Amino acid sequence: MSIITDVYAREVLDSRGNPTLEVEVYTESGAFGRGMVPSGASTGEHEAVELRDGDKSRYGGLGTQKAVDNVNNVIAEAIIGYDVRDQQAIDRAMIALDGTPNKGKLGANAILGVSIAVARAAADYLEVPLYSYLGGFNTKVLPTPMMNIINGGSHSDAPIAFQEFMILPVGAPTFKEALRYGAEIFHALKKILKSRGLETAVGDEGGFAPRFEGTEDGVETIIAAIEAAGYVPGKDVFIGFDCASSEFYDKERKVYDYTKFEGEGAAVRTSAEQIDYLEELVNKYPIITIEDGMDENDWDGWKALTERLGKKVQLVGDDFFVTNTDYLARGIKEGAANSILIKVNQIGTLTETFEAIEMAKEAGYTAVVSHRSGETEDSTIADIAVATNAGQIKTGSLSRTDRIAKYNQLLRIEDQLGEVAQYKGLQAFYNLKK
């Protein structure tokens, strides 16, 4: 009854209006699961391959019909007949079927769509919530959200190099209250921007993309919004960055070239100067987390940054680790970063995603479950965050339904868990000396 009888993929659109995959899995019992695949704008060079058609006459070359065909004509044939509850066996079968180290043959987008749909179908078959199916009886931790309320870098047209300015409502007693803190700060920020005559249009992840005078102007405006909403910076709410440094790192000159986004006259920093600058910001403002503060291939820089700031700030590897246990294992061994960003489409299966989270926790690294800038209404990452007790989630600002869908799912989960639910807040940063 739990045997897979049909697998079907179709091309749909993501939050940027670009094609992506939606996959459906059916079982003998009638149980059903659907998975949709996100897509990134700033991507690590070591990420699993997102298969695109390359036909410029259709969606500007971004079509996903090849990946759709791979699901319908290759993967489906391989996994029909499997028990839908055997997630690892199905994921391993798809990895073997692809046969490449980066899923470049079938496409990580094709494989991931199936992986998510299989998990959802299994949960449907067992008549349990997805988070409960994936995590078991010990599932209880609601994640502290990193809310990206200012978008810069590759996520907007704002002249700021750093890609994300985030607020983290660590002082809230519950996830529901944390979400309220964030929403109130978001609206307070909008009022401040309007009063300054700055733009209130939003970027890919729902945050504002105003033309600030620079990074510090952005941070100080966020602090003003936190205070205007009635909260205390550095107590109720902290600040975080996603620098996405690989987006403005000049490999030939080996410098961090802020002029790429901030224009003529902006800073050009060596690796050592980049670390000095980040430390200066940490000492000046209530910053608790920095993602991709160094380029993905600047291992010496990462190690130096971790040695300098790793005990008081969460240093998250995104492009640096690409949700890959090989890169994470090296980082752990060499003392680079102290946290990993978890993006399911960077690696391509739920099995490998869970392995990365487990490896991080065993090493004392935190794991931050994350969306992508090109999202869908699929809320699987909310369930993954709770299922793994990851403790942190990054899923955008307090606008755009593609972001709010994840927050609303977390509200439902918190309700369902009832008294068992725990919101860790500041305790989610267990690797810091607070």
UniProtKB/Swiss-Prot annotation:
The gene is eno. InterPro entries: Enolase, Enolase-like_C_sf, Enolase-like_N, Enolase_C, Enolase_CS, Enolase_N. One of its GO terms (biological process) is glycolytic process. Its EC number is 4.2.1.11. Catalyzes the reversible conversion of 2-phosphoglycerate (2-PG) into phosphoenolpyruvate (PEP). It is essential for the degradation of carbohydrates via glycolysis. Belongs to the enolase family. Pfam families: Enolase_C, Enolase_N. This is Enolase. Its cofactor is Mg(2+). CDD domains: enolase. The active site is at residues 205, 343. It catalyses: (2R)-2-phosphoglycerate = phosphoenolpyruvate + H2O. Pathway: Carbohydrate degradation; glycolysis; pyruvate from D-glyceraldehyde 3-phosphate: step 4/5. One of its GO terms (cellular component) is peptidoglycan-based cell wall. Its main location: cytoplasm. One of its GO terms (molecular function) is magnesium ion binding. The lineage of its organism: Bacteria, Bacillati, Bacillota, Bacilli, Lactobacillales. It comes from Streptococcus sanguinis (strain SK36). Transmembrane segments: none annotated. NCBIfam families: eno. The keyword Lipid biosynthesis does not apply. Mg(2+) binds at residues 242, 291, 318. It is found in: Cytoplasm; Secreted; Cell surface.
